[in-house]
A protein has these predicted regions:
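Histidine- and acidic-residue-rich, metal-dependent catalytic cores
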Residues: 2-128
Length: 128
């Protein structure tokens, strides 16, 4: 019997969430691609760390699935007006249900102004 890998769980979750609504995961995939390119270029992370960060970046808006029914399609609303609500829901999800819970704070900070992140650990800052 083969062990289930974190990557397999991530892909299962991503694909299941896409069935509920595609927008957050499609947006997350684009963000993850940009995060990967920027962090790889920076040269501060090993490939396995980049893989974890790409997983978190892909699902950074997972909290949007907890917003009001029907509002998920209004990306401007949950990215701007309700940004803290979906950021906190996403943080709680990753903190409690994730093999990469050490990166959960990046989800909570992903809408915070860069200048306010000065006291935050650089890995969270890079991801946020």
């Amino acid at each position: 019997m083969e062990y289930i890998k974190s990557k397999d769980i991530f892909l299962l979750m991503r694909d299941t969430l896409k069935l509920i609504h595609q927008r957050p995961m499609a947006h997350g995939s684009r963000v993850a691609y940009m995060v990967y390119l920027m962090l790889r270029e920076g040269g501060r992370y090993e490939e396995f760390e980049l893989a974890d960060m790409v997983m978190v970046a892909t699902m950074h808006d997972i909290g949007a699935y907890m917003t009001e029914a029907g509002k998920i399609n209004d990306i401007l609303r949950y990215e701007a007006k309700d940004s803290m609500a979906h950021s906190i829901y996403g943080y709680l999800f990753f903190k409690h249900l994730s093999p990469v819970k050490d990166l959960a704070k990046a989800i909570m900070y992903h809408h915070m102004d860069y200048d306010k992140l000065q006291k935050v650990d650089y890995a969270y800052k890079d991801l946020a």
